[in-house]
Structure formats: C-alpha cells, structure tokens
Amino acid sequence: MKKRLDVLLVERGLATSREKAKAMIMAGEVLVDNEREDKAGSMFPEEVEIVLKGKPLPYVSRGGLKLEKAMKNFNLTLDGKVCMDVGASTGGFTDCMLQNGAVKVYSVDVGHGQLDWKLRNDPRVVCMERTNIRYVVTEDIEERPSFVSIDVSFISLTKVLLPVRNLMEENGEIAALIKPQFEAGREKVGKKGVVSDPAVHKEVIEMVISYAKSISFGVRHLEFSPIKGPEGNIEYLVHLVRLPDGVTEEETNVDVDAVVKSAHDTLDK
C-alpha cells in the first residue's frame, strides 16, 4: 500500500505534523531511497527508506525561518515581551517568538484548526482562531503587544496595518511580510498567482512603505524573505516602529532597489 510522503514522515515520528513534514520536504531535507524528494504528495510504499539530512527544522513550520531572519537582521529582541502573530496559521512565527523569550503570544488567524498542537497547549499562547484582525479591538486582549508579526494572504497589508497599530503599545515594533502577489493589481499577477517582475516588486514595496508612513509608522529596515512563498513568489520583510499619533517621518533609510535586486540575485538562481 502506498502513502503520501508527508503522511509517512508523521507516522514514523520524523515530523510532528503534516505541515511540518511539508516544510521539511520543500526545504530539501528528505531523502527517499537516497534521492531528494520535494513533493509532499508523492506516493511511496510504506516500507520505503526515508532519511532526513541536514539539521531539522527548528520550528513547527518553515514560516519561523522568515521571522528568524527578521530578528537577526532587524536586531529585534523579544525577551519578556507580549507579542502578536497575525496570520498565525500553523504557528511558525509564534514558535519562533516563544523560542526567543516572548512571555505571551496572541496567535490570530481567520482559519481554524491549523495551529500546531504543541502551541495550542502552551499556556503562553492565546489561540484566536476564526478571528479577522481587522475587527479585533483592545477589549479582546488583556495586554497591548509590543511586537507584532504579520503574515497574511489574499489581502493587502494596507488593510491590516491600521487595525494592528490600534492594538499596539507606543513604540511597538512590527515585522511584516510584503507579498507582491497580494499587493499588485490583478493585471500584474501572472499564471498561478506569481509576480516575477522586479519593477512590480519595487512598486508594491514603495506603496506599502508610503502607506505605513502615512499612519505614523517609522520604517526601519527592509529585507527579502529567506524562502519563497508556496507558488514560488519572492516576499519581503519590513520592520516598522509605531510612532506617536500624527507623527510622520519623511525620510527612510531603506534601499528598495538594492533589496529587490539582492532578492532576485539570490532566490532566482
């Protein structure tokens, strides 16, 4: 009898969930009969030899690797902080926050049943599933977060940043993913929802940055995500700081052109 590769990984105890198994497979960490296999849905006999290579994924999903890069490159410190993970899904960002000292994480997602069981049972995690961040108010949470990550799909960041700002502590920080496929006009999105034109990437990044500045966020850093999105889209990480109401910073020190070029040079090989 044949089974999916991600199912076999979970059954053998090589992965804690199918989502984590998929992340490991996509990261090239799984060898089947000494051959690298990158499709989670590939079917194999139950007795097939499966070997993991390299160091195991440290988070419940590969999303944690995105926040890990943001923390290193943006000099973020989460020790002792209350945080919020918007678009939590399986909880890769939440897991990364906890492993870096967060004392509490509000894990917010419009879906349900996705958050990894380990995190769902962690007393430091408040699972806010079936929850649209656009309608969350301060009365829904016990403390204002001082750090928020945003990883949302099928919606522009410009629809999410203001509701998040209204929940945050003064001087709170954000690490948000800019996803060109959900920011660009429909006519600029290619087959399978892929946006590959660097000029469009630059355009949507500048649009998001301009909007963030208009609602009193300071823009501190910009980097490209270390891994592509599910369909192969390059994504970007932006570091924002909540300024006092009505305060705007005209200048930013981020070089959008350089970051976009570096992203394509690195990830399009």
Feature locations, PLM:
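Short, glycine-/aromatic-enriched active-site segment of Class I SAM-dependent methyltransferases
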Residues: 180-196
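Conserved SAM-binding loop of SAM-dependent methyltransferases across substrates and taxa
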Residues: 90-101
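Glycine-rich helix-loop-beta junction characteristic of Rossmann-like nucleotide cofactor-binding loops
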Residues: 14, 72-79, 139-142
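A basic, amphipathic helix-loop patch mediating RNA/tRNA/ribosome contacts
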Residues: 1-48, 82-83
